[in-house]
A protein has these predicted regions:
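Amphipathic alpha-helical segments within well-ordered protein domains
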Residues: 17, 196-199, 214-218
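Conserved NTP/Mg2+-binding pocket subregion across the NTase superfamily
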Residues: 71-183
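Structured mid-to-C-terminal alpha-helical surface segments
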Residues: 206-230, 234-278
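Catalytic metal-binding acidic patch
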Residues: 32-68, 72, 81-88
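Amphipathic alpha-helix face/heptad-repeat signature
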Residues: 8, 162-165, 191, 265
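Helical scaffold of the NTase/Pol beta-like nucleotidyltransferase catalytic core
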Residues: 1-31, 61-63, 278
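Internal helical hairpin/lid segments
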Residues: 166-209
């Protein structure tokens, strides 16, 4: 990670040191995930995603101590916030689609604090698909801060589980309220590019950053396909290309697409991925 800015590099080193203080030899791996692992970290915009791997289950006291040491008030995060998940080694290596975590922490100057002390406490309404997909990304793109390479520490999902979690994620996003009207809707660009990432993973088997996935989809020359029961795809791909290009530009300060545009594209992507499972 030679291209990381110094504040983030120092933060990750301090985070691993603090985790080692709490867990000792039970800490067998630490991995940068998300935008850091995918080489797309943007200071001021991105979160810091970290997965820790422990040898054995953690009792509640150690989970609480870990959260106390790593929350923003104790270890200030230089990004929007930290999203940290701790897995047992056997869970990380299992390829399970289930959440399976020991403890989860969200914390930061611009992120609401949240600690979830066990996977069974995670509300289904908040999405249970995140963890299997995150571990799939870690398998391909995780950066080892401590321990063996991420490809050894994390198993990938089976094709059937991957497809199910991708469709679960798209349905979850589609169930959120849609900004009304045809004007620019902040956040719609991430909805479009997130769907691009899912579609590229489904078509090509690789995880890319959101922007790189959008560019890959444009290079495909093949938009999200129309299927029975799905939204009609643009037959030429021009409308899709324009939507993706505007979404990429929005991440650099341009106007985002509208909510209905983003939803229509998400439905196209869902229709293509779900059709393979029918």
């Amino acid at each position: 990670m030679t291209d990381l800015d110094p504040p983030l590099r120092r933060y990750l080193a301090d985070l691993v040191a603090a985790a080692r203080d709490v867990l000792g030899d039970d800490l067998v791996g630490a991995y940068a995930a998300g935008s850091v692992g995918l080489g797309a970290y943007q200071p001021g915009r991105s979160d810091v995603d970290v997965a820790l791997v422990c040898a054995d289950a953690l009792d509640l006291g150690r989970r609480q101590e870990l959260v106390a040491r790593l929350r923003h008030e104790a270890l200030p995060c230089p990004a929007r916030g930290l999203e940290l998940v701790v897995y047992r080694r056997e869970v990380a290596r299992s390829g399970t689609p289930e959440p399976g975590f020991e403890v989860e922490l969200n914390t930061g100057a611009r992120m609401p604090f949240r600690a979830t002390w066990a996977a069974v406490d995670r509300p289904a309404r908040d999405g249970l698909f995140w963890y299997g997909l995150d571990r799939s990304i870690l398998h391909q793109c995780g950066y080892a801060l401590l321990g063996p390479p991420a490809a050894e520490a994390f198993a990938d999902l089976s094709p059937a589980d991957l497809r199910r979690l991708l469709t679960d994620a798209l349905r979850w996003w589609l169930a959120l309220p849609t900004p009304p009207g045809d004007g620019p809707a902040p956040g719609a660009e991430d909805a479009v590019l997130g769907a691009c990432r899912s579609l590229v993973r489904f078509r090509h088997g690789v995880w890319l950053s959101k922007v790189d996935a959008g560019r890959r989809l444009i290079d495909d020359g093949r938009p999200a396909e129309a299927t029975a029961g799905g939204a009609a795809a643009d037959p030429t791909g021009d409308a899709t290309d324009d939507l993706v290009e505007r979404s990429i530009a929005a991440r650099a300060g341009g106007p985002p697409p509208s909510g209905p545009e983003a939803r229509a594209f998400q439905r196209q992507v869902l229709a293509e991925i779900a059709a393979e499972a029918a």
